[in-house]
Swiss-Prot record:
Subcellular location: Cytoplasm
PANTHER family hit by this protein: EUKARYOTIC TRANSLATION INITIATION FACTOR 3 SUBUNIT G (PTHR10352)
Highest classification ranks of the organism: Eukaryota, Fungi, Dikarya, Ascomycota, Pezizomycotina
Organism of this sequence: Aspergillus fumigatus (strain ATCC MYA-4609 / CBS 101355 / FGSC A1100 / Af293)
Keywords of the record: Cytoplasm, Initiation factor, Protein biosynthesis, RNA-binding
Any one GO BP annotation for this protein: translational termination
Name the record gives this protein: Eukaryotic translation initiation factor 3 subunit G
The gene coding this protein: tif35
Length: 290
């Protein structure tokens, strides 16, 4: 009898009892219209079990990306991620929106003014959303001080000052030492700035004569590819490919500087009308600043 009693106790131990704190497993059902219905359970703030039903529709969005970027995505994972499936791992990667931070030149002053004015002035983002940086030399979306052609091409203001009337030399140099007015005048607009022989371009004058302007460039073009195309005709000293700040794609034009003008002329003759990435390149000498 003792053995039978022990067996009965063992049978009772094998019985499975429902745990009130356990949640049912998630259920995923595929519908006829292609959507999925996901049923899950959770506890709310009051400790009650809540059933959550979600209907998920999968949408495929195709976008054209740089072929080199697509190639890097197909590389096999290495390190701690070696052997994992392609794509980001949700255990180690959090996919979010790519936010690019671009502060303005005087963002500290604007932030201080916004704090003093209060919420009625709006946020800094609302104040700066319509402002864009424009280079005074090549009209690109970057600061003039960072322009790669600042030594070979003159700014627009300097070109206007060079064409000033000769009688302007008699005007006192406002803004200089000992000036009577408090207004500041840039050095290139002061007395004698437009006189002949004072512009010292030096070695960059030669680079200015050997610079080509290439238009109708593909959006997927790279500076290294343009350098390889033009280095066949001579030594290339500088390659500048204008890019869009938001998409980082080429804006359709580039500047190629050669060490020798003869090589630049030969490259202009051969590459003008050349087919590159299903587009016909237009190559000409960059306009020299007067």
């Amino acid at each position: 009898m003792s053995r039978l009693g022990n067996r009965a106790a063992d049978w009772a131990d094998d019985e499975e009892f429902d745990d009130p704190s356990a949640l049912p497993a998630q259920q995923v059902t595929t519908n006829k219209d292609g959507t999925k219905t996901v049923v899950s359970y959770r506890f709310n703030d009051e400790g009650k079990k809540v059933k959550v039903t979600r209907r998920i529709k999968t949408t495929v969005v195709r976008e054209h990306v740089n072929p080199q970027v697509a190639e890097r995505r197909s590389w096999a994972k290495f390190g701690l991620e070696k052997g994992h499936a392609a794509g980001p791992s949700f255990d180690t990667t959090s996919v979010g929106e790519n936010i690019v931070f671009r502060p303005s030149v005087n963002w500290r002053v604007q932030a201080a003014e916004a704090e003093k004015a209060g919420p009625e002035k709006g946020s800094i983002k609302d104040q700066l959303k319509d402002k864009k940086v424009k280079c005074r030399i090549c009209s690109g979306e970057h600061f003039t001080a960072r322009c790669p052609f600042k030594d070979t091409m003159a700014p627009v203001d300097e070109t206007a000052a060079a064409g000033a009337e000769p009688g302007a030399d008699d005007v006192p140099a406002a803004g200089g030492l000992g000036a009577g007015t408090s207004s500041y005048v840039p050095p290139h607009l002061r007395k004698g700035a437009a006189a002949g022989g004072e512009r010292m371009a030096g070695k960059y004058e030669k680079d200015d004569l050997a610079t080509l302007r290439v238009t109708n460039v593909s959006e997927l073009a790279e500076e290294s590819e343009l350098r390889d195309l033009f280095e066949r005709f001579g030594r290339v000293t500088r390659v500048f490919l204008a890019r869009d700040r938001e998409t980082q794609r080429a804006k359709g034009f580039a500047f190629i500087s050669f060490a020798d003008r003869t090589d630049a002329a030969r490259a202009c003759e051969k590459m003008d009308g050349f087919g590159y990435r299903h587009l016909i390149l237009r190559v000409e000498f960059a306009k020299r600043a007067t």
